[in-house]
Structures are given as C-alpha cells and as structure tokens.
Amino acid sequence: MLKSFKTEINPSEEQKVKIHKTIGTCRFIYNFYLAHNKELYNNGEKFMSSNRFRVWLNNEYLSEHPEYSWIKEAYSKAVIQSVNNGQTAFTRFFNHESAFPKFKKKGRSDVKMYFVKNNPKDCRCERHRINIPSLGWVRIKEKGYIPTTKDGYVVKSGTVSMKADRYYVSVLVEISDNKIADNSNAGIGIDLGLKDFAIVSNGKTYKNINKSARLKKLEKQLIREQRCLSRKYENLKKGEVTQRANIQKQKLKVQKLHHKIDNIRTDYINKTIAEIVKTKPSYITIEDLNVNGMMKNRHLSKAVASQKFYEFRTKLQIKCNENGIELRIVDRWYPSSKTCHCCGAIKKDLKLSDRIFKCSCGYVEDRDLNAALNLRDAITYEVA
C-alpha cells in the first residue's frame, strides 16, 4: 500500500530559488488555465481539457508569445500537475461538489511543486537526505523519518511546499501491508465538542487545546503582530515613509505565528488519535458532524474552525485502516446527546447550556459522556 510521509527539509540557497520559481510557474499556469477556460466560455466555445490545453500552450501559445518562454524552465511534471489540478477543480464544480474555481494569489494560496519518479535514480531516499528531480539531493531535518531506498522502499511521487519561510517535502512510499490486527478490546464511542475536544465512552476526556495558556498567549501575540502589520499598510496608503522590506518582515512574523499555532493543534490531534488507537478497540464510532452548518453560526465559527474536526476524522480513518479497526459513522441527525443511555427516552427540550443530562428515569450523567455511550451502542451506522 501507499503511505505518505511529510517532513521539513533544509534546501540550499540555489535550491530555494528553484523551488520559488517552480511554485510561481505552477501558480501562473493554474491561473492561466482558469482564465483561458473562462474566456472560452464567454465566447461560447467548448471547454478545454488539461491535455488539450497543454498541447495548445506548447505548440501555439508559447511560439506566438516568446516572452513567456520562462515557463519551459520549470520542472515539466510540476507544470503538468498544476494544469491537472485546474481540471479537477472544474470537474468538482461541474459535479456540484464545490464552488467555482478561484485564482491562486501569491502568498495566500497553497501551491506545491509536484514531482514523480521517472527513472531509478529519481526520488532516492537516504537517512539524512532525499533526491528530488530538478533539485538534486536535499537535506532532511528529521533524520530517518522517511523509509530509505536502501531498505527496499520506493518513493512513487511527492510534493515540495513552502509555509512561513519553511520548506517541506511530502512523499508517497510503497510499503508492505503485512500487519496482523489484534483488536480484541470492546468498541468505543467518541463525542467531539467545543467545551472538551473529545469525550470517549471509556471515561477518558481530551481537553480543548485552544483553552490552554500556551495557545491563548500565542493568539494574543498574533493579534498584536497583526495590528502592527495593519498600521504599516495604513501608513503606506497614506503616503508616509514605510519601507516595504519592513512590511515583508512583519508579514513573515504573522505567518510564523499562524504556522506555530496550527502545528500545536495538529500535533495535539495526532497524539490524541495515537492514544485512542493504542487501546486497540474492535471498533470506533463517531458522529458525522455538519461542520459547514456549524461554521455559519458567527458566534461559534472561530471555535469550530480551531478544533479541526474534519482533520481529526480524516486522520482517525487512516489510522483505523492501518490498524484494522472498524470506523463507524453515525448519521448527523442521530440524537446522541438527547437520548438517555439508560432507558432510551429522548429528551427533546435539552438545551446546549445543559451540561448535565437528567432523565425522568433517574439517570444522571455528563451530557457529552452520555452522547459517547450512545454512539458506542448505536445500531444504525455506516462503515468508513
């Protein structure tokens, strides 16, 4: 099976220039593909697929516009993948799965440099470095994290990305799937929430990391740095003396703080999932949360976004597949919080402010733990 590994790299200055050029070219080609298809649509012409666009770009457009010859200097596979990403975005729009594709803006969009293994010498990986096409050998900061070629592992493809002045490589490695699952323990239910991040039916509670003193301090620092950046932009608009280099420095400070906060949240999710999976349950049941609907509530949207529920579900599903654990998804309309775990009665007048569930049968329990118990014993579900 294929497994992904992502780690930070330490490229040289020359390699950094190549990464910046390739990512910039990929962003330009992606935007050009969107703009060209919009123009074709306005003229009443047929939609151009990624294959037709590449033929038209190489055989017609670049020969007529030599000023864009710098496009050919970038790694060809990365450029091809950016066009394919554009077609995927249109396909999702045509299938009513997402909104109309948006242009990618420099510094604000997640654009990556894609690479693939074309010959045996490409994508070789050693303990402390990896060979990336068009870049050569690049040093890895976390030594030994990616399985090495010497041990018989094969890197199929990967991407190089940049975030807050730090560079990362993500690779797909072909590994053998020979794990024998030993999940003899009872199943568990997990209720996700805002007061606490996750409540497990076995009584374990994972606190909301966003309420920790460390994150609160970082968020206050982020507000101060954002305010400072806004003042610099305002001074620039007014015509006052403000060096653009100082704006870029301040912008980088803000990006690094965003990145640090995001890394803390992601690390907490990874550790939570690892701890849950180590208990070796026979199955795990979670609720299909309507995150998009929750985000529409302006009072809760920030708190919901910071919890990263979708990332938790995605990573939990991957870990369950790797360890042979059945992941059950209960419908979002299942009244897990309002149902009494003791007698099965539904308390329709339960409010969000009611933190203790009290039933007429005499059953009293924390509402989140009651929901986790109901999810564990749910009969109607789908296997992810």
Mark where each language-model region is.
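Gly/serine-rich nucleotide phosphate-binding loop at the start of the catalytic core
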Residues: 1-79
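Positively charged, helix-rich recognition surfaces that bind polyanionic ligands
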Residues: 3, 148-151, 163-384
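Well-ordered beta-strand positions in beta-sheet-rich domains
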Residues: 4-8, 137, 157, 187
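Beta-strand secondary-structure signal
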Residues: 6-8, 85, 129, 168-170, ...
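Stable alpha-helical structural segments in soluble proteins, enriched in small hydrophobic residues
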Residues: 33, 78, 82-93, 369-379, ...
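Long, hydrophobic, amphipathic alpha-helical segments used as structural scaffolds
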Residues: 34-41, 90, 94-101, 175
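Acidic carboxylate diad motif detector
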Residues: 52-163
